[in-house]
UniProtKB/Swiss-Prot annotation:
Organism this protein belongs to: Aeromonas hydrophila subsp. hydrophila (strain ATCC 7966 / DSM 30187 / BCRC 13018 / CCUG 14551 / JCM 1027 / KCTC 2358 / NCIMB 9240 / NCTC 8049)
Organismal lineage: Bacteria, Pseudomonadati, Pseudomonadota, Gammaproteobacteria, Aeromonadales
Xref: NCBIfam families: atpD (TIGR01039)
Keyword Zinc-finger recorded: no
Superkingdom of this protein's organism: Bacteria
Subunit and partners: F-type ATPases have 2 components, CF(1) - the catalytic core - and CF(0) - the membrane proton channel. CF(1) has five subunits: alpha(3), beta(3), gamma(1), delta(1), epsilon(1). CF(0) has three main subunits: a(1), b(2) and c(9-12). The alpha and beta chains form an alternating ring which encloses part of the gamma chain. CF(1) is attached to CF(0) by a central stalk formed by the gamma and epsilon chains, while a peripheral stalk is formed by the delta and b chains.
Catalytic activity: ATP + H2O + 4 H(+)(in) = ADP + phosphate + 5 H(+)(out)
Name of the protein described by the UniProt record: ATP synthase subunit beta
Enzyme Commission number(s) of this protein: 7.1.2.2
A Gene Ontology term for the protein's cellular component: plasma membrane
Swiss-Prot/TrEMBL keywords: ATP synthesis, ATP-binding, Cell inner membrane, Cell membrane, CF(1), Hydrogen ion transport, Ion transport, Membrane, Nucleotide-binding, Translocase, Transport
Length: 462
């Protein structure tokens, strides 16, 4: 336990001088011990810059810090509570409770910096995780123990989709979940907490928040805090769900820290260590022989450009990508998932079975043909199409509408009750549309319903 003194403060980056023979190691946690504003502030060592001086990022606001304040080295990295005592609680990046419900009462604490499981410890699984959301289960099915990205620009429904997934899986799947709110709105965090409370699944979820208004150090590390809690559940032999909203803010916090530490920026101003930082996080999110982590990550797409370095780096790590499209949202079809852009490694006849595979590909073929015909329709009108193409367009429009679905978490806004659709029902419905069994029904009947039986009922009332 060595002591040092603050020598320089530049925003969230602080330089601290220690005796030459007691310089802290990189990632060691330091704490301000001098009385006054800033007391108890935790800092994490990022660089040793010679002469006994270490450069740190603050894990909280640097307001009130001044040169000469005394800092003590804890001799270890940031340690956070893990285990069942974290369930139903909201914590910050350091694992301190922020829900005013008293101490966590944990039995052990783990470091947030841990090595990824070794190659021989990892395991793969082809089991599917049913989400109850038609478009996802059909076109981009999730694997148990896999990684899923929800890609979308601003305001197309990433957080709502994520909340619906958590609700459906928590209720139907009865496992534990960890939710890491990385640099998102405090209001959303609050809504999410109350949503979990009303669904009676709060006692199965650990919540870790590092919001938009917090310093970059918090936002950069909060994903690791949540992941550490998920790893503990996995190592106890459980199947755990790990949700991150939003992985882009993790990258952005890294960009801010990188600039403050004086590193040269790379493409589009991102940090030069972008791929490495992403890899360090993503490689730990994996399934081992003892348990699995299934992760769902929301990925903000800057300016709707999927080739931006941040989303492009994330793509490489995922098993399934759910792409949310502004064009589909503009049609009023929610969830606004693009069935032609979304992919999954599980959509393979050997994994999902021939029936599911052919139905999904059939749906995509019809929608792709409709997309090609749209130009002709815009210029010449529907009358110039062949009978076969007219039928394709009619079915495509029904499929488009049938891909929409009322959500449980959006009942407050839509006024229609949420629907959970089992995979078998989803396949049966789309097969029927492709075979022409519902050609006589009006397309409005397919909008915002659950199973195909509801479509038939709705059509009778129209």
């Amino acid at each position: 336990m060595s002591n040092g003194f603050i020598v320089q403060i530049i925003g969230a980056v602080v330089d601290i001088e220690f005796p030459q023979d007691a310089v802290p190691q990189v990632y060691d946690a330091l704490k301000v011990v001098s009385e006054g504003q800033g007391q108890g502030l935790v800092l994490e060592v990022q660089q040793q810059i010679g002469g006994g001086v270490v450069r740190c990022i603050t894990m909280g606001s640097s307001d009130g810090l001044r040169r000469g304040l005394e800092v003590v080295n804890s001799g270890k990295s940031i340690q956070v509570p893990v285990g069942v005592s974290t369930l139903g609680r909201i914590m910050n990046v350091l694992g301190d409770p922020i829900d005013e419900k008293g101490p966590i009462g944990e039995e052990e604490r783990w470091s947030i910096h841990r090595a990824a499981p070794s190659y021989e410890d990892q395991s793969n699984s082809n089991d599917l995780l049913e989400t109850g959301i038609k478009v996802i289960d059909l076109v981009c099915p999730f694997a148990k123990g896999g990684k899923v990205g929800l890609f979308g620009g601003a305001g197309v429904g990433k957080t709502v989709n994520m909340m619906e997934l958590i609700r459906n899986i928590a209720i139907e799947h009865s496992g534990y979940s960890v939710f890491a709110g990385v640099g998102e709105r405090t209001r959303e965090g609050n809504d999410f907490y109350h949503e979990m409370m009303e669904s009676n699944v709060l006692d199965k979820v650990s919540l870790v928040y590092g919001q938009m208004n917090e310093p970059p150090g918090n936002r950069l590390r909060v994903a690791l805090t949540g992941l550490t809690m998920a790893e503990k559940f996995r190592d106890e032999g459980r199947d755990v769900l790990f949700f991150v909203d939003n992985i882009y803010r993790y990258t952005l916090a890294g960009t801010e820290v990188s600039a403050l530490l004086g590193r040269m920026p790379s493409a589009v101003g991102y940090q030069p260590t972008l791929a490495e930082e992403m890899g360090v996080l993503q490689e730990r999110i994996t399934s081992t022989k003892t348990g699995s982590i299934t992760s769902v990550q929301a990925v903000y797409v800057p300016a709707d450009d999927l080739t931006d370095p941040s989303p492009a780096t994330t793509f490489a790590h995922l098993d399934a990508t759910v792409v949310l499209s502004r064009q589909i949202a503009a049609l009023g079809i929610y969830p606004a998932v693009d069935p032609l852009d979304s992919t999954s490694r599980q959509l393979d006849p050997l994994v999902v079975g021939k029936e599911h595979y052919e139905t999904a590909r059939g749906v995509q073929t019809v929608l792709q043909r409709y997309k090609e015909l749209k130009d002709i329709i815009a210029i010449l009108g529907m009358d110039e199409l062949s009978e076969e193409d007219k039928l394709t367009v009619a079915r495509a429009r029904k499929i488009e509408r049938f891909l929409s679905q009322p959500f449980f978490v959006a009942e407050v806004f839509t006024g229609s009750p949420g629907k959970y659709v089992p995979l078998k029902e989803t396949i049966r419905g789309f097969q029927g549309i492709l075979k022409g069994e519902y050609d006589d029904l009006p397309e409005q009947a397919f909008y915002m319903v659950g199973s195909i039986d509801e479509v038939v009922e709705k059509a009778k009332k129209l």
